[in-house]
Swiss-Prot record:
Residues 116-133 have a biased composition (Acidic residues). Residues 453-884 form the FH2 domain. The lineage of its organism: Eukaryota, Viridiplantae, Streptophyta, Embryophyta, Tracheophyta. This is Formin-like protein 7. Might be involved in the organization and polarity of the actin cytoskeleton. Residues 173-205, 914-929 have a biased composition (Low complexity). Belongs to the formin-like family. Class-I subfamily. Residues 23-37, 104-115 have a biased composition (Basic and acidic residues). One of its GO terms (molecular function) is actin filament binding. Residues 372-439 have a biased composition (Pro residues). Residues 253-262, 355-370, 871-890 have a biased composition (Polar residues). Residues 12-22, 92-103 have a biased composition (Basic residues). Residues 159-172 have a biased composition (Gly residues). Residues 1-50, 90-470, 868-929 are annotated as: Disordered.
Length: 929
């Protein structure tokens, strides 16, 4: 096995030597087999070299043959492999006449390696060691045709001084040689090949920058009847020190591409990188396989599919036919025992594709690196004829291609009559296209999804969801859900959609836009705002909620039709400011470009400049009747309440009892001997409790007034009885009489609240609202007058109705105002009558509130007294029965007395004994006066 490296200085030579020595041992003339190619080691590829060089284990040795690879300075471009044994046996290869530096020399002029060479040679400055020596260089005659079978090779050896080292001058190449065991090969002869002999396959002087010495040439015939590249430009595509020579027409070979020697892809197919295919599985036509996909050796791929990148397949596959329209891509290590190949015109092979050195490629096919696959072509695609040779005036050589995963295609060669098909365009960086879908039918899940999609009707309205926990009935037991499936109930779907569906409202026919209406009549997309956009949107929401057109609104303003209060309130609420109204009226642009609210306001104000003033007056007209009626009712209630409080009655008796009780309790203090008290103290009577905490001052006062009124009622009753000659109460005891007085007085005091009905109503009137209502009515009447004054000479139906309303409202409001002044004076007098200084308070209706609360407290006290009285009546029969058993001589009449006391009196009417009470109260007041 032989490798050729460009001379690259002592440092690079030392690195090359260390790499070759570490990976390839030649001690004893025996080469250790690489585990990658036949050993038992790992199948992983060797780590990339930091200098970009390729090493022996990256290539397979063919029995009886030597592979020679030329690598440039950066290790990018691989030229080709060659069977050198046939050339050596035929005498067409001349051995190196000038062995490099020191070392054993054989009789044939070649440097010996392995056991014949010292293994511990560590000279860094010497290139010639056990694994590196100078090689020959071959060159094809420029006159030799690429398709001729008798191509010759000439040897070019730079014998001159000039450039040496660093890859810049000299142009010499070196090869590493090693002995390897022979393997059977179908393409090699039985004769053994001297493995120490090295051969070169490219001209070093063509790459150098400064070698100017004499060159010796010898012609050689290319093996297999093929031809070698005609210039270094064909075998070197990157990193050269000088511009490469022009390529032959239609050819392009990228660096680092070594082709398998026996894999002949059929026309129309290709294979992606790092993929070695099985020995008996040809891909069907129209398919391709990418690298790194582990394929079986006999599994055919269905149409439209391909394996993924870097498939690790069998490495001993025979020729794998590829259909037409496909090609073999990057870094694909194929089988190593195939027939020689030559590259016809119109084809090129970009870099990094490990292909066979003698695999014929039909026209129309090419090999690319890191490029997406081309679309498959027909199975029996015929190759186009090769292009004619270039004319005498050849174009200048193209610039060297940039370093990258793939080199661009060369420019089309000039032809005289006709040119071949142009090279394909550069592949995109997005990678190969996705494989076509499986031609088989849909899967089960796909069928399910399709079935579900068929049941969904896009026009069916969507209903509101019902959030529940879905359950599956248990088939192992009987459940209620098993009986529901076969039920006969069916709901009304239309009704359910109407109630729970999200159905878009269709516009009415009157508001719908005709189909033949032009786009210019509709609202433009770019709207113009006179008002603030946010304010305009808010007004538009209100206007749309009314459901009225601008014509209906204008008709309402001009004719004065009756409208609902809510509608007029919304229209009056969106009134713009005077400045905004001026801007809207002065707008001289296209009204159709205005926003919805701005456009509607523009048309309304243009038709009726005082539109929103009319809305306010019309709203006042509608609400005037209810507001005036409420105000009149409040005035009547206040007047009646004042009259109730000024009448002398039971309320005076209660105040008298409270005053006397307070003076008795405050005797000897500054608060005692009072002549009057503030009525706010009435609310505090229930807070003063007795010593035993069983009663309050309020209960005591009310009970005393009840007893007093009951006694008065009993006296009046006795007077009437004495006139009739009956004396029913003469035989009653004092205790029984007290109970009788309380029973007769409770209905009298309990009916006090009914005598102050208007007082309790007046307490519910808010003083601020009462005053503000009258002021608001007067203000709106003035606004109506102002509107009518501004509209003089502009009479319409609406203004006529407003004038009639104004005349009646103005007169009525004057009467209400005067009545209100009179009643408020009455309220002030009543307040001063009960408590002096109360006029300083802000709320003049506070007196009514205090008395209402006190009357409620009195009613509660009466209820408590009646409850206690019933308890005493229930305990009295038991005591009487015990007394009767101890004194049996008691008369039946006395024993029957407890039964008489157990009788419950009926509830008396509210005004019972009112006349007698009034008479007695009047007599008392007269005596006091």
């Amino acid at each position: 096995m032989s490798f050729l490296f460009r001379k690259n200085g002592s440092s690079s030579r030392r690195k090359i030597k260390e790499k070759l020595r570490g990976r390839h041992s030649d001690r004893g003339g025996k080469r250790e087999e690489d585990e990658r190619y036949g050993g038992s080691g790992s199948d992983l590829p060797p780590p990339p070299s930091p200098w970009g060089f390729l090493f022996p284990e990256d290539f397979v040795r063919i029995d009886g043959n030597l592979k020679a690879v030329i690598v440039d300075d950066e290790g990018l471009d691989v030229i080709y492999w060659k069977k050198l044994l046939e050339l050596e046996n035929s005498g067409k290869i001349r051995k190196n006449p000038k062995p490099r530096r020191r070392g054993d020399k054989s009789g044939d002029g070649f440097r010996r390696t392995g056991a014949d060479q010292d293994d511990n040679d560590d000279g860094d400055d010497e290139v010639g060691d056990e694994s590196i020596e100078e090689a020959f260089s071959f060159h094809v005659k420029k006159s030799q045709s690429a398709s001729s079978s008798g191509g010759e090779i000439r040897d070019q050896s730079n014998n001159g001084g000039g450039g040496g080292g660093g890859g810049g001058g000299g142009g010499r190449y070196y090869t590493s040689s090693s002995a390897s065991p022979s393997r059977p090969s179908s393409s090699s002869a039985s004769a053994a090949s001297p493995s120490r002999t090295s051969y070169a396959t490219s001209a070093g002087s063509d790459y150098g920058g400064g070698g100017g010495g004499k060159q010796s040439q010898s012609k050689f015939q290319a093996p297999g009847g093929g031809s070698f590249p005609s210039s270094p430009s064909q075998i070197h595509s990157g990193g050269g020190r000088s511009p490469p020579l022009p390529l032959p027409p239609g050819q392009f070979t990228a660096g680092n591409a070594s082709f398998p020697s026996s894999t002949q892809p059929p026309p129309g197919q290709y294979m992606a990188g790092n993929a070695s295919f099985p020995s008996s599985t040809p891909p069907p036509p129209g398919q391709y396989m990418a690298g790194n996909a582990p394929f079986s050796s006999s599994t055919p791929l269905p149409p439209g599919q391909y394996p993924a990148v870097n498939a690790q397949l069998s490495t001993s596959a025979p020729s794998v036919p590829l259909p037409p329209g496909q090609y073999t891509a990057v870094n694909a290590p194929f089988s190593t025992s195939t027939q020689p190949v030559s590259l016809p015109p119109g084809q090129y092979m970009p870099g990094n594709a490990a292909l066979s050195a003698s695999t014929p490629l039909t026209p129309g096919q090419f090999t690319t690196a890191n490029a997406p696959p081309a679309p498959p072509g027909p199975a029996n695609q015929t190759s186009p004829p090769p292009p004619p040779p270039p004319s005498a005036a050849a174009p200048p050589p193209p610039p060297p291609p940039k370093k990258g995963p793939a080199a661009p295609p060369p420019p089309p060669p000039p032809g005289k009559k006709g040119a071949g098909p142009p090279p394909p365009p550069p592949m995109s960086k997005k990678g190969p296209p996705k494989p076509p879908g499986n031609p088989k039918g849909p899967t089960k899940s796909g069928e399910t999804s399709l079935a579900v999609g068929k049941t969904e009707d896009p026009t069916q309205p969507k209903l509101k969801p019902l959030h529940w926990d879905k359950m599956n009935p248990d088939a192992s037991r009987s459940m209620v859900w098993h009986k529901i499936d076969g039920g006969s109930f069916n709901f009304d779907g239309d009704l359910m959609e109407a109630l729970f569906g999200y159905v878009a409202r269709k516009p009415s026919e009157s508001n719908s836009v005709p189909q033949n209406q032009t786009v210019s009549n509709s609202v433009p997309h770019n709207q113009t705002y006179i008002l603030d956009p946010r304010k305009s949107q808010n007004k538009a929401i209100v206007l749309k909620s009314l459901g009225m057109t601008k014509e209906e609104i204008i008709d309402l303003l001009t004719e004065g039709h009756d409208a609902e209060s809510d509608t007029l309130e919304k229209l009056a609420g969106i009134a713009p400011t005077p400045e905004e109204q001026t801007e809207i009226i002065d707008f001289d642009g296209e009204p159709m470009t205005l926003a919805y609210a701005d456009s509607l306001l523009f048309h309304i104000l243009k038709a009726v400049p005082s539109a929103f003033n009319r809305f306010n007056v019309m709203l006042f007209k509608i609400n005037y009747g209810s507001e005036v009626a409420q105000q009149k009712g409040s005035l009547l209630t206040l007047e009646s309440a004042c009259n109730e409080l000024r009448a002398r009655g039971l309320f005076m008796k209660l105040l008298e009892a409270i005053l006397k009780a307070g003076n008795r309790m405050n005797a000897g203090t500054a608060r005692g001997n009072a002549q009057a008290f503030n009525l706010t103290a009435l609310r505090k009577l229930s807070d003063v409790k007795s010593v035993d905490a069983k009663t309050t001052l309020l209960h005591f006062v009310v009970e005393e007034v009840v007893r007093s009124e009951g006694k008065r009622a009993a006296m009046n009753k006795n007077m009437m009885s004495s006139d009739n000659g009956s004396g029913e109460n003469a035989d009653m005891s004092r205790e029984e009489q007290e109970i009788e007085f309380i029973k007769m007085g409770l209905p009298i005091i309990g009916g006090l609240s009914s005598e102050f009905t208007n007082v309790k109503k007046a307490a519910g009137i808010d003083y601020d609202s009462f005053v503000a209502t009258t002021l608001a009515l007067g203000t709106r009447v003035k606004e109506t007058k102002r509107l009518l004054d501004q509209s003089k000479g502009k009479e319409d139906g609406c203004l006529t109705k407003l004038r009639s309303f104004f005349e009646s409202a103005e007169e009525e409001l004057k009467v209400i105002t005067e009545e209100q002044l009179r009643i408020m004076e009455l309220v002030k007098k009543t307040t001063n009558y009960y408590q002096a200084g109360a006029l300083k308070e802000r709320n003049l209706f506070q007196l009514f509130v205090i008395i209402r609360d006190f009357l409620g407290m009195v009613d509660n006290a009466c209820s408590e007294i009646a409850r206690n009285q019933r308890k005493q009546q229930q305990q009295r029969p038991a005591t009487t029965v015990a007394g009767a058993s101890s004194s049996p001589a008691e008369t039946p009449s006395v024993a029957a007395a407890p039964q008489r006391n157990a009788v419950r009196f009926p509830i008396l009417p509210p005004n019972f004994m009112s006349e007698s009470s009034r008479y007695s109260s009047s007599s008392d007041s007269d005596s006091e006066s």
